[in-house]
């Protein structure tokens, strides 16, 4: 389902670009061959034209004594793996975001049902308080207060319905689909692992795509420094030409003869030595920056995992307390309604009890969502699922 997501497809294209760059760097270690055939016809003073041709094949190979090309290949290899980890990071983020949006829909459905049920009950309460007013047992102020509370809950119902629609649209957009109804279960039907790790070993953190990306970024910076240092040393290139030609200086020979030549070239930077040394300093500084970024990524990873574990544990411990709170508030609502019927309390106490119950019920649902969300966050913080990749 996620393969249609534009962010994931963009990340895949970046992997393909890095793979092509790596292939180019590998080919630079091999000799290059060039075929440059030439031919022409010439005549002098209306004499018979003479045909000359030259069919040379030229080979050129840089002897990588100081590992300039090898370091360039290794740098591009690290960049290739870095692009793979970026794609994995996008994939893991998409999975986590999709799960969070799905659980958000389940939470909103539950809150919508609670608010809708409460609105129906409060509509009956408004009718009852109006009847009591007609019987001289309640005041107009009591009717107005109950009506205002009912309208407030009805407004919440409308807002929750809007939030459900917007969340469905967000999930459809994430999946690169047109807006439609999302089939889903209830919040209570969602199941998560009962036991979670307390204390996370470093080996688990190393599975995170951002940690691995930072590691490959550091490797790339290291080889970039080595590549810049190699530019201080001479480049040695061997070249040779073999081919057939019938042009031997000022003479034309037929049939053509085999022509062989070989040459060597040594290129030593002199006037660019200062610029090359500056590039080495820049590369070293960038390598140190990559090291610091790697260390900070490790620290951030540990913090995110611990935060997710703490949030999940807190939500699970709070669940029982919310259950007790809701049960107590239900009894409070029943008691105050009964007392009001016998004239022992006022409508304000009943109204307060109902509002407190509604608030607690919504918070109870939100706490269940927080528990589910923290498990998803933990999945993301630990790197998510891994894909098996092989460098081409």
Tell me the role of every PLM-derived stretch.
Residues 1-21, 137-139, 189-219, 269-270, ...:
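Bacterial Sec-pathway N-terminal export signals of envelope proteins
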Residues 9-10, 26-27, 63-91, 141, ...:
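Sec/SRP-type N-terminal targeting helices
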Residues 20, 27, 85, 92, ...:
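Regular, well-ordered alpha-helical segments
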Residues 36-60, 181-197, 203, 226, ...:
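Small/polar, glycine/serine/threonine/aspartate-rich low-complexity segments that form flexible
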Residues 52-54, 100, 145, 259-261, ...:
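Transmembrane beta-barrel architecture of outer-membrane proteins
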Residues 69, 78, 85-200, 311, ...:
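Periplasmic alpha-helical coiled-coil/stalk elements that build and connect Gram-negative outer-membrane
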Residues 179, 192, 309, 363-392:
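Acidic, low-complexity, intrinsically disordered peripheral segments
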Residues 327-351, 376-391:
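A glycine-biased, small/acidic residue-tolerant capping/turn segment at secondary-structure junctions
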């Amino acid at each position: 389902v996620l393969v249609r997501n534009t962010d994931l497809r963009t990340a895949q294209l970046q992997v393909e670009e890095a793979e092509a760059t790596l292939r180019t760097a590998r080919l630079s270690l091999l000799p290059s061959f060039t075929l440059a055939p030439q031919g022409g016809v010439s005549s002098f003073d209306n004499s018979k034209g003479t045909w000359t041709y030259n069919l040379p094949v030229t080979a050129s190979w840089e002897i990588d004594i100081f590992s300039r090309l090898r370091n360039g290949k290794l740098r591009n290899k690290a960049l290739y793996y870095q692009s793979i980890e970026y794609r994995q990071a996008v994939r893991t983020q998409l999975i986590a975001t999709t799960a969070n949006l799905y659980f958000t829909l389940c939470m909103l459905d539950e809150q919508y049902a609670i608010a809708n049920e409460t609105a129906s009950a409060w509509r009956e309460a408004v009718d009852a308080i109006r009847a009591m007013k007609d019987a001289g047992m309640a005041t107009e102020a009591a009717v107005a207060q109950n009506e205002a509370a009912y309208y407030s809950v009805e407004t919440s119902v409308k807002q929750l319905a809007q939030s459900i629609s917007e969340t469905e649209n967000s999930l459809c957009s994430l999946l690169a689909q047109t807006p439609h109804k999302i089939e889903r279960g209830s919040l209570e039907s969602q199941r998560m692992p009962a036991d979670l790790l307390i204390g996370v070993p470093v080996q688990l953190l190393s599975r995170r795509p951002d940690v691995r990306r930072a590691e490959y970024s550091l490797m790339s910076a290291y080889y970039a420094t080595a590549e810049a240092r190699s530019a201080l040393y001479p480049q040695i290139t061997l070249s040779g030409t073999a081919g057939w030609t019938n042009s031997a200086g000022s003479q034309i020979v037929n049939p053509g003869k085999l022509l062989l030549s070989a040459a060597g070239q040594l290129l030593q930077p002199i006037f660019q030595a200062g610029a090359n040394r500056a590039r080495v300093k820049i590369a070293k500084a960038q390598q140190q920056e990559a090291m610091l970024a790697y260390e900070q990524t490790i620290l951030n990873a540990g913090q995110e995992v611990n935060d997710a574990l703490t949030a999940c544990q807190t939500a699970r411990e709070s669940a029982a307390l919310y259950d007790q709170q809701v049960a107590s508030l239900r009894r409070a609502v029943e008691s105050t309604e009964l007392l009001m019927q016998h004239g022992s309390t006022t409508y304000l106490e009943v109204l307060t009890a109902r509002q407190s119950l509604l608030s607690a019920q919504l918070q109870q649902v939100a706490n269940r969502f927080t528990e589910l969300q923290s498990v998803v966050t933990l999945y993301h913080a630990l790197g998510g699922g891994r894909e098996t990749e092989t460098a081409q």
